[in-house]
């Protein structure tokens, strides 16, 4: 058994710790609720699109969620559209719609009050 690749990988681990990373900050909210996400205060206003693939289906495309949000930063207020897993550049970083619950189902429509959104902000490096 050749241990050399394993030893090299273990020796490289401390070097990975030296990489500069900025931790992401997240918040989970409903429509109309405001979350502090990094330097932003974000309020989801309206689901513009929810084309996610239903749990019971096999889809070629996973689909997406488009969400209208109000963002307050440094006293300024603006309305933006965020799209699932597509970062939006704001306030020296990126705002991302990182998760949406509940999963879609072909058997029932999701009521607006049932949506939960996970928003994440990552500072630019």
Q: Residue ranges of each PLM-predicted region?
A:
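C-terminal motif of bacterial Sec signal peptides marking the signal peptidase cleavage site
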Residues: 15-18
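Short, exposed beta-strand-loop hairpins at the edges of beta-sheets
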Residues: 104-114, 118-121
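Extracytoplasmic
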Residues: 37-39, 62-66, 77, 90-92, ...
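Short Fe-S-cluster ligation motifs
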Residues: 82-105
């Amino acid at each position: 058994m050749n241990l050399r690749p394993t030893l090299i990988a273990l020796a490289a681990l401390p070097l990975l710790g030296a990489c500069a990373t900025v931790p992401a900050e997240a918040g989970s909210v409903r429509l109309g609720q405001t979350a502090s996400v990094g330097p932003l205060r974000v309020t989801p206003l309206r689901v513009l699109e929810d084309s996610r693939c239903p749990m019971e289906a096999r889809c070629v495309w996973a689909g997406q969620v488009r969400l209208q949000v109000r963002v307050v930063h440094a006293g300024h207020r603006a309305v933006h559209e965020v799209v699932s897993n597509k970062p939006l550049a704001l306030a020296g970083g990126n705002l991302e719609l990182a998760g949406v619950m509940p999963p879609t189902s072909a058997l029932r429509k999701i009521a607006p009050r049932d949506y939960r959104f996970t928003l994440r902000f990552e500072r630019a490096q």
